[in-house]
Amino acid sequence: MAASVEHDSLESMEAPQTAVEVEETKTFKDLGVTDVLCEACDQLGWTKPTKIQIEAIPLALQGRDIIGLAETGSGKTGAFALPILNALLETPQRLFALVLTPTRELAFQISEQFEALGSSIGVQCAVIVGGIDSMSQSLALAKKPHIVIATPGRLIDHLENTKGFNLRALKYLVMDEADRILNMDFETEVDKILKVIPRDRKTFLFSATMTKKVQKLQRAALKNPVKCAVSSKYQTVEKLQQYYLFIPSKFKDTYLVYILNELAGNSFMIFCSTCNNTQRTALLLRNLGFTAIPLHGQMSQSKRLGSLNKFKAKARSILLATDVASRGLDIPHVDVVVNFDIPTHSKDYIHRVGRTARAGRSGKAITFVTQYDVELFQRIEHLIGKKLPVFPTQDDEVMMLTERVTEAQRFARMELREHGEKKKRSREDVGDNDDTEGAIGVRNKVAGGKMKKRKGR
């Protein structure tokens, strides 16, 4: 009898730092995953399990409740999807599992992974999120899918108003990005959901950080859980090269264009603090010939998914986003993250830069620091426990870009104004004219299109 795994207190299964040799020999079959799902992993290119999967999957297959703490990009979705599908194969049932997520985009992404892993066994998923017609979701729920992936608010709406829909037979509950769910003030909704699902269930809670709110939720929702932690409290991955640039705020646009030219050929994710600045900067870059596309909360759901898919398909090399896009999204080819606007909350820095250097790859993160951001930047350095180096620039070359950037700024402001007026007239969502791709005429006025790097560099 393994007494060490059976006592009542929260246990810790820290991943040993010296276990590299063991990890290299582990396969999904070694973890106890059934053959048909191992084949699905092979087809998805999952050659070997990640650290969090090695820690969590065997315990989940034993029927334990799990708290998974792992850095962004660590394979968390596979860590809960594989045990759930394994159990579904053994005891097939409709409305078998519920996955709660903080954002719509993450919900669709999790659904894609469940459907890909379960394609050979006919797994059916329903995504229940805001911004999409409730009636079509009600019809999807009436078909009783195996897996429901939902944001808490819209799920409560269906539990209260959709006739015949309930989760009384649910076997698995997953809360993914639990810290973000709670930070978005979904606590009331989560409490309501916990009251209408069976107590006799398995619960997996995954979070990048173990906040006080997450600890409180863990006590309310999990029974004798085991903790699988593969990262320190606040950690950025080892292969991430982190830099900062201290610049006057009026030159931020110019330095951004310089960096995009210097690192041309890479894919970029650029974080802005507001929807308006995301849209403005996307227009600015488009006017200069860059393949930039925005993703923010004022865009319609279809436009947000469209932007995301264009970027994932490499049809666009630059994605400008607010923090709505900074957590959980599996975009495998981001080479460089730029914090164009420094995050107000230091923890958001961890999640933003977690878009690059994922699953063993290397990447860069560059944070713009203006005269107004020094205190916020110092908090970030304190949180991650290191002083960041300056990203090298040639200031004279940056200043040579000023005239053209200024002209592009002017046209971007004009387009934003025109769009605002059109929105008032037609009451369209700001994202429905998204996306800056209609700015061809304006772009042609900005001499020369995309800037060329100077010869000899």
UniProtKB/Swiss-Prot annotation:
Metal-binding found in the keyword field: no
Annotated keywords: Acetylation, Apoptosis, ATP-binding, Helicase, Hydrolase, mRNA processing, mRNA splicing, Nucleotide-binding, Nucleus, Phosphoprotein, RNA-binding, rRNA processing
Enzyme class: hydrolase
Catalysed reaction, written as an equation: ATP + H2O = ADP + phosphate + H(+)
Annotated Pfam families: DEAD, Helicase_C
Any one Gene Ontology BP term: extrinsic apoptotic signaling pathway via death domain receptors
SUPFAM superfamilies named among the record's database cross-references: P-loop containing nucleoside triphosphate hydrolases (SSF52540)
Phosphoserine PTM positions: 9, 426
Quaternary structure and interacting proteins, as annotated: Interacts with AGO1 and AGO2. Interacts with GABARAP. Interacts with NOL8; the interaction is RNA-dependent.
Protein name as annotated: Probable ATP-dependent RNA helicase DDX47
Gene: DDX47
